[in-house]
Design a protein with these regions (language model features):
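An N-cap/entry alpha-helix motif that binds or orients negatively charged groups
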Residues: 2-80, 331
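Flexible, glycine/proline-enriched loop segments at strand-loop-helix junctions
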Residues: 95, 120-122, 144-151, 184-189
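N-terminal functional module of multi-domain proteins
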Residues: 44-130
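N-terminal pre-core extensions flanking Radical SAM catalytic domains
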Residues: 311-329
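Long, hydrophobic, well-ordered secondary-structure blocks that form the structural core
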Residues: 118, 128-155
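Short beta-alpha connecting loops at secondary-structure transitions
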Residues: 294-305
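Short hydrophobic alpha-helical runs that function as membrane-insertion/retention elements
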Residues: 118-123, 145-147, 232-233, 287-289
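Alpha/beta enzyme core
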Residues: 110, 139, 151-266, 273-296, ...
């Protein structure tokens, strides 16, 4: 099954909201919530994709003709490429009835592990969502990162107790999920966290801890102060706040401020291996890609994620070769035009 065939299959089964577009740029689903759309006018979601397209590559092939190495190491694990499947949930609500969260996570986590990368998994008000994700991660030898919503402290600690039993490579919290419209007013409540509260959560987790939803230098510094091992520069795919800058726009300043002090991941509108190269050149250590992995699972089942990973890795390696970078460590900001 090839990439085009998977896209075709996904269009037939991904429900009324996601169109499984050839390029997942947000134009067809824009403000569609339920569905994969953005909050408000969807300006943030659309800007994420658009700004990566405005970054241009400086080619330079006067260099050694050597093999390209895309391998990436984080928290003691080595991956085929600096790519993670991003956090998504409420699959039936947003993407169609073919998969519930438990089945989706089973397929995603195991398929990503087989493809040489790892998946972030989601959380929800139904305890079975986290339980199912943790079961999938444990079955894959810990090759996955459960993402806990910013619930009240009692609920967060209970979730972390469950996480510990699965022994994942790390644990994450999407701190910006407090802005999701469909989490408003639910029980347990979700909301923002102080540095001290995050410090308590991180101490309790006893695992490398990733704070997702960082969009400012000050936010990155607070995550570092709280003891985070990594951050994800993210605006939740444009789903939590309208009229925000893109992740491509804020990444360089954040990387300049905290790069080397913690691991920096980024998501939001990255759609091919060239985009991944741009993110690494701007200071990220790795990337998360969300919505396209949904399309791959819906259209290709267990085969889908591996097809996407292979495509992204090949595109990344090709861009590296055309810029004279033979390893991720050799990717520099001046390989981008105007930087």
């Amino acid at each position: 099954m090839d990439y085009s065939e998977i896209l075709k299959n996904a269009r037939e089964c991904s429900g009324p909201y996601c169109k499984a577009c050839p390029v997942c740029n947000g134009m067809a689903c824009r403000t569609q919530v339920p569905g994969p759309g953005g909050k408000g006018t969807a300006a943030t979601m659309l800007r994420n994709y658009q700004k990566w397209q405005e970054v241009c590559i400086n080619m330079d092939t006067i260099c050694e003709n050597a093999p390209i190495d895309t391998t990436f190491t984080m928290f003691g694990r080595t991956f085929a490429a600096p790519i993670f499947a991003g956090t998504l949930g409420a699959m039936k609500r947003h993407y169609g009835d073919k998969y519930d969260d438990l089945t989706y996570n089973d397929i995603l986590v195991s398929s990503c592990a087989q493809a040489g990368i790892a998946a972030f998994t989601g959380d929800g008000t139904n305890p079975a969502v986290m339980e199912g994700a943790l079961h999938a991660i444990a079955a894959s030898g810990g090759a996955g990162i459960p993402t806990v919503k910013p619930w009240n402290m009692e609920t967060v600690f209970a979730k972390l107790d469950a996480v510990r039993q699965a022994d994942p490579m790390a644990v994450a919290m999407d701190i910006d999920a407090a802005g999701l419209p469909f989490l408003k007013g639910l029980t347990p409540p979700a909301g923002s966290k102080t540095v001290e509260e995050l410090r308590q959560i991180i101490d309790y987790a006893k695992k490398p801890f990733i704070i997702k939803g960082i969009m400012t230098v000050r936010g990155a510094q607070k995550a570092l102060e709280a003891g985070a091992s990594a951050i994800v520069v993210s605006n939740h795919g444009g789903r939590v706040q309208d009229q925000c800058p893109s992740t491509a726009e804020v990444l360089p300043a954040i990387a300049d401020a905290v790069g080397g002090k913690l691991t920096i991941l980024v998501d939001g509108g990255l759609r091919n291996g060239t985009d991944i190269f741009k993110a690494l050149a701007l200071g990220a250590d790795g990337v998360l890609i969300g919505r396209p992995f949904v399309t791959m699972v819906y259209g290709g089942g267990a085969q889908g994620p591996g097809v996407l990973v292979k495509k992204l890795q090949a595109e990344l390696a090709d861009t590296m070769a055309m810029c004279g970078a033979h390893s991720l460590a050799e990717i520099r900001r001046d390989m981008l035009f105007g930087y």
